[in-house]
């Protein structure tokens, strides 16, 4: 069954632009430091759409290694004014909310959000799956076995210590399959499920690279794949570069992902990634008249 929200899945690469409504994003682009962060978020959204972005992903809680969790109240105070403004200014844009809290998801869906992007794959909040199902929303389920105490900091930025895996690709795939079962049992339609391997979460540099290398093996599950590698620590540590200089590494990782099964790219650098994806799609789907 086709996903009506993203009808060209499998025929084009979708680009999801990251809008961080935080003061402490790892990428340094958190908008909460701005005096009028709502207006700044709207301007960033407008630029993203002009550059070819397909989906806007709003997050109000930093997931960088070592970040302090925030309350649902604080999360909603940051998110709802922007969601309402975006819905008023851009009624047709696809809106994704990066949250793992059911109460936050419910409030944002009531204001017109389309997608819930849960970094815990419905494993954190027992009410999340049912909340998404009742709203008939699309769900992004990310693999994540991170423990908060496992953050490691260095001059190249924070990263998470890896979890021990005997076979990381198989274990990630099995974990995601269980997340799908959890979602479907709660009433989420299978055509509204997207999977994310969770690059950068609870994985070593080597594990991230190996999982990315074998991302095509996740296609066996039969669901669209979202890839989120933009500016992440494994790129910085591989290239010995701070987060502000990771564009080329991010583009390389995203290109590999597209060529090996990724359907959606979650990125900070929208314009450059849109051009990359359009060129790759032109080559991949080319036919002679």
How should these model regions be labeled?
Residues 2-4, 9-10, 25-44, 63-81, ...:
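Active-site-adjacent loop and "lid" segments of alpha/beta metabolic enzymes
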Residues 9, 50, 189-190:
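Glycine-rich phosphate/diphosphate-binding loops that line cofactor/substrate pockets in enzymes
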Residues 14-16, 192, 224:
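Structural motif
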Residues 43-59, 260:
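Catalytic domains of carbohydrate-active enzymes, especially glycoside hydrolases
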Residues 92, 189-192:
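Short acidic capping loops at alpha-helix termini that bridge into adjacent secondary structure
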């Amino acid at each position: 069954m086709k996903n009506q929200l993203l009808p060209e899945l499998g025929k084009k690469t979708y680009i999801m632009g990251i809008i961080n409504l935080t003061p402490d994003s790892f990428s340094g682009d958190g908008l909460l430091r701005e005096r009028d962060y709502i207006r700044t978020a709207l301007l960033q959204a407008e630029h993203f759409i002009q550059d070819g972005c397909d989906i806007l992903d709003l997050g109000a809680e930093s997931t960088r290694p070592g970040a302090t969790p925030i309350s649902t109240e604080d999360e909603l105070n940051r998110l709802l004014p922007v969601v309402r403004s975006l819905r008023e200014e851009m009624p047709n844009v696809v809106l994704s909310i990066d949250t793992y809290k059911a109460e936050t998801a419910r409030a944002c869906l009531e204001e017109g959000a389309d997608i819930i992007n849960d970094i815990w794959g419905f494993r954190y909040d027992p009410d999340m799956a049912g909340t998404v199902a009742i709203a008939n929303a699309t769900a992004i389920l990310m693999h994540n076995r991170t423990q908060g105490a496992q953050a490691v900091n260095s001059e190249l930025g924070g990263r998470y210590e890896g979890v021990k895996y005997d076979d990381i690709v198989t274990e990630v795939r099995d974990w995601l399959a269980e997340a799908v079962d959890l979602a479907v049992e709660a009433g989420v339609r299978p055509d509204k499920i997207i999977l994310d391997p969770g690059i950068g979460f609870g994985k070593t540099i080597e594990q991230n690279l190996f999982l990315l290398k074998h991302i095509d093996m996740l296609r066996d599950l039969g669901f669209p794949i979202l890839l989120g590698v933009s500016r992440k620590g494994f790129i910085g540590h591989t290239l010995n570069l701070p987060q502000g200089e990771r564009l080329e590494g991010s583009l390389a990782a995203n290109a590999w992902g597209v060529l090996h099964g990724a359907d959606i790219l979650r990125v900070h650098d929208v314009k450059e990634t849109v051009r990359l994806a359009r060129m790759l799609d032109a080559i991949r789907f080319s036919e002679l008249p």
